[in-house]
A protein has these predicted regions:
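Bacterial N-terminal signal peptides that target proteins for export
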Residues: 1-13
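Intrinsic structural disorder/low-complexity segments
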Residues: 6-8, 17, 338
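Short, flexible, surface-exposed loop segments at domain boundaries
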Residues: 21-85, 90-423
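Bacterial N-terminal signal peptides
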Residues: 10-22
Length: 423
């Protein structure tokens, strides 16, 4: 594969090879984020697992975490919650939890709950990642279940500068196994361990602007119709999932996608970027409040930092002198206030300043601070609280009922089975 193109976001995400050793040491100690501060990525606990449940409206879900043991399929789902400024990446682009198919294997960088009293998922003992769970081994239920960065395999590889080298393929009846090793793009590790993964007729193969099938590779003589063949360390990016495996193999992952070149993964990233841009424009840009200057008769000037991880064109819409709306939200980014949606009770007014931070910006922050003036401030827009902001040129639409709060009850924040109608 030629040099993989990377977006501007990598400058924020990639902290440099020199930090790797320090990151490992720092990550050994559980870290709890502080209110009003973006936590350092190098202090996050790293793990990976299969997405098995999603509550997209509350930005939480469950992963089957890969532990030190060999019986992966026995590992119980482990709940996680996205931090308000937490970033989701899918196929090399910004994403929402709703964009990621169940079964996708994801890489996690997580922390302890910032405030255990308001956690949207169970709060576990601080040392829980060191506990052994039978044959599953250690690490399947870490207490660091509040996520700063959640990314699929292709996004992870692009961020850290790695690729998969395909060693050999074994094929029979349009399904089989591939042996591959994960390598650095810049240097080859001859001692890198190989991993065997399965594929089948549903595996998507992308080359340039084409989507190929296994039969296409057979017809071109690249893969055998049956049997084994060396792939000569072909460099690719992979999408990885998990499926039940025959032959009493307890832990073996499955290939959902193979991107054969830069063009293929760049097209996937562009498509996902457009999906996410449309989503954010309808749900508004998340931010947190740095300061509030109160004026007379309910007027106020709010200083807020926009959260990071979005496409640059979204931030470009925040311009000095343009109009905007600001609404208070939960730590789940679910809109509060309003009987029929976020615009009902939102503060209105002009954006009077936009300031971009020079230098390194922590993951989770955009490095962009806005000042917003309103003649009627609402409860919930206070320093340290999370808000969503809509520039005046974004469409005003009504979000679905499950994505905003009409009351402040715990039942509405986290619905129980009682929400179902009684027929």
């Amino acid at each position: 594969m030629t040099h993989l193109q990377s977006g501007r976001w990598i400058a924020v995400l990639y902290l440099g090879v020199s930090l790797v050793t320090n990151a490992v040491i720092a990550a050994d100690e559980p870290f709890r984020p502080e209110a009003g501060k973006f936590p350092p990525l190098e202090k996050a606990h790293a793990y990976r697992g299969e997405l098995v449940f999603v509550d997209h409206a509350n930005r939480r879900g469950s992963l089957r975490v890969q532990g030190a043991g060999g019986t992966y399929f026995r590992n119980a789902p482990h709940p996680f919650a996205m931090l308000p400024y937490g970033i989701v990446r899918y196929q090399g682009a910004p994403a929402d939890l709703r964009d990621i198919p169940l079964g996708t294997v994801l890489h996690v960088r997580g922390f302890l709950p910032p405030d255990p009293k308001t956690s949207a998922v169970p709060v576990l003992p601080v040392n829980n990642r060191n506990k052994t769970a039978g044959y599953s081994g250690k690490g399947i239920a870490p207490a660091e279940n509040h996520v700063l960065l959640l990314e699929d395999e292709s996004s992870y590889c692009q961020r850290v500068g790695k690729v998969w080298n395909l060693k050999r393929v074994e094929l029979k009846n349009n399904q089989g196994k591939i042996d591959a090793s994960l390598q650095s793009k810049s240097s080859k590790d001859i001692e890198a361990s190989e991993e065997t993964m399965t594929f089948d007729a549903a595996t998507r193969i992308w080359r340039g602007r084409e989507r190929l099938e296994i039969q296409d590779l057979i017809d071109e003589g690249i893969w055998p119709a049956s049997g084994k063949k060396s792939l000569d360390d072909q460099t690719v990016l992979l999408g990885i999932t998990w499926k039940p495996t025959p032959s009493a193999v307890f832990t073996r992952f499955h290939i959902s996608d193979i991107w054969l070149d830069d063009t293929a993964i760049e097209r996937a990233a562009r498509n996902q970027t457009e999906t996410h841009k449309a989503f954010i424009r309808s749900r508004w840009m998340p931010a947190w409040v740095d300061a509030v200057e109160y004026g007379k008769f309910g007027s106020a000037t709010v200083t807020a930092t926009l959260f990071g991880g979005m496409d640059g064109s979204l931030y470009a819409d925040f311009k000095k002198g343009s109009s905007g709306l600001m609404n208070a939200v939960e730590s789940t980014l679910k809109h509060g206030h309003g009987a029929y949606g976020p615009a009902h009770m939102a503060c209105r007014g002009p954006i009077i300043d936009v300031v971009r931070t020079d230098g390194e910006v922590p993951l989770g922050s955009s490095g962009i601070q806005i000042r917003f003036k309103t003649d009627l401030i609402i409860e919930g827009i206070r320093p340290g609280r999370v808000v969503r902001v809509r520039p005046g040129n974004w469409p005003q639409v009504n979000v679905p009922r499950e994505e905003y709060l009409g009351t402040s009850t715990i039942e509405e924040r986290f619905p129980t089975p009682a929400i179902f109608p009684k027929y």
